[in-house]
Swiss-Prot record:
This is UPF0223 protein OB1419. Transmembrane segments: none annotated. Pfam families: UPF0223. InterPro entries: BH2638-like_sf (IPR023324), UPF0223 (IPR007920). It comes from Oceanobacillus iheyensis (strain DSM 14371 / CIP 107618 / JCM 11309 / KCTC 3954 / HTE831). Belongs to the UPF0223 family.
């Protein structure tokens, strides 16, 4: 991994850790597989930190441009499936 996760300098240390954990799980969904409930739980926490839809879209775009992984598609798949594990 030779890129940085998108973040906001106004976030607390705990919030930064939670956002990094969310983006790390997105990576894992592409590289291995992840628990659907874990994705949804971390996304809910992400939305507490980033409630604005436009800010979410901006961060998702920055992450996708840096990593090639789409957070939007992982979250969408987790919401729409009943499978316990997600793999992209």
């Amino acid at each position: 991994m030779s890129y940085q996760y998108p973040m906001d300098e106004t976030w607390s240390t705990e919030e930064i850790i939670d956002v990094v954990n969310f983006f790390s799980l997105i990576e894992k969904a592409y590289e291995k597989q992840v628990d659907r409930e874990e994705i949804l739980a971390l996304y809910r926490r992400f939305k507490q930190i980033v409630p604005s839809k436009s800010e979410e879209k901006k961060l998702f775009t920055q992450f996708q441009e840096a990593s090639g992984y789409s957070s939007y598609h992982v979250v969408k798949k987790a919401r729409e499936t009943n499978e316990s594990n997600i793999r992209m």
